[in-house]
């Protein structure tokens, strides 16, 4: 009887481990390029967690609020565009993201919005005017030749994330 009980317990443990292994990878997207916009932490963020970042090319370092200003669920499209000063990324936001960006651009004038891709800072823009249309432009500190692939990777990640929410 004791051998049967031990066998039953071992069998139950094996089933639990096999089920937990199945859930471990659920929701994980391999090779993800997750874009998020973070606001520079410049006083007044008392209880907010501040994370130090260092820009890849300039070496400029400062703190950003750990909670994203705009997350991957609020970004609807990303384009690589040519503007007067060179190549830039254009982010189109949904209504919730546009509203948050507008509020931040009004109340945090002079602060930077940092583009983080999978947790790594790649670009920043100073909030110099209110952004009312939900379209955010930023330059990066990456070489122009890397931008096209970055945009493709971010779009692919967004498509996979958004398709899982439907």
Per-segment meaning from a language model:
Residues 1-20:
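Sec-dependent bacterial lipoprotein signal peptides
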């Amino acid at each position: 009887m004791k051998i049967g009980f031990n066998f039953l317990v071992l069998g139950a443990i094996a089933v639990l481990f096999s089920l937990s292994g199945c859930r471990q990878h659920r929701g994980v997207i391999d090779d993800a390029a997750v874009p998020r916009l973070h606001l520079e932490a410049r006083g007044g963020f008392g209880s907010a967690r501040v994370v130090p970042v260092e820009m890849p090319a300039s070496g400029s370092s400062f703190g950003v609020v750990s909670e994203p200003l705009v997350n991957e669920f609020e970004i609807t499209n990303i384009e690589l565009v040519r503007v007067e000063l060179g190549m830039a990324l254009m982010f189109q936001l949904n209504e919730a993201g546009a509203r948050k960006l507008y509020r931040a651009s009004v109340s945090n004038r002079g602060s930077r919005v940092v583009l983080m891709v999978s947790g790594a800072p790649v670009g920043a823009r100073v909030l110099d005017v209110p952004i009312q249309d939900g379209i955010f432009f930023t330059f990066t500190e990456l070489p122009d030749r890397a931008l096209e692939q970055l945009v493709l990777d971010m779009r692919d990640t967004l498509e996979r994330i958004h398709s899982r929410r439907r």
